[in-house]
UniProtKB/Swiss-Prot annotation:
Primary site of residence: membrane
Annotated signal sequence range: 1-19
Organism from which the protein derives: Escherichia coli
Protein name: Lysis protein for colicins E2 and E3
GO cellular component, one term: cell outer membrane
A Pfam family per the record: Lysis_col
Amino acid sequence: MKKITGIILLLLAVIILSACQANYIRDVQGGTVSPSSTAEVTGLATQ
């Protein structure tokens, strides 16, 4: 039972991380109209 919980937590972490990375990449490419929280945290200048 403990192993299943660990696998589920790992999957959730991967999904969350990949979602954050997708937002970060979109910010770098200037895909957003307004700077998102990730751009503000990393200090990226949005055009």
